[in-house]
Amino acid sequence: IRDRTYTIGVKQCGTPHYPTTPVEAKFSTPYTVAAACVHGELALKQFTKESINDENVRELACRVKVEEAKHFTARYPDHWGCDVEVKCCDGNVFTHEVTDASGSVHNPLTHEQAKDKFMDLCMPEMGLKKCKQTMDEILHIEQLTCLPSL
């Protein structure tokens, strides 16, 4: 797997050192690419000790190479893009380019994506009922007379 991005992205997150903590994992492109491939998503649960210790993720992360691509560096900091190329054992090659990261100024989350992210981040701490209640209060904040429950 080859991930090409802007220079600062390579310097900040392109280290081949395998993460040992959730914080290190969040700043490791090889880890995040591998975890997304293995688990089919990249959510908060991929940044746990259990996921970091997953041998399938570790093995795949060792095969991720992060490189600078001049056209992404030229667009940075206005655009935070990258492209990924995956070469499969059967010879198939898959590529995908993203001009702007999901959730960025130029590629904002949809309303549904923002709600899903909120639930993913809050449910482990708040539980489903409190999380839904809090999200509803936030979505209707202009109608609240006070914010004590938030």
Feature-to-residue mapping (PLM):
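Terminal-appendage/accessory-domain detector
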Residues: 2-150
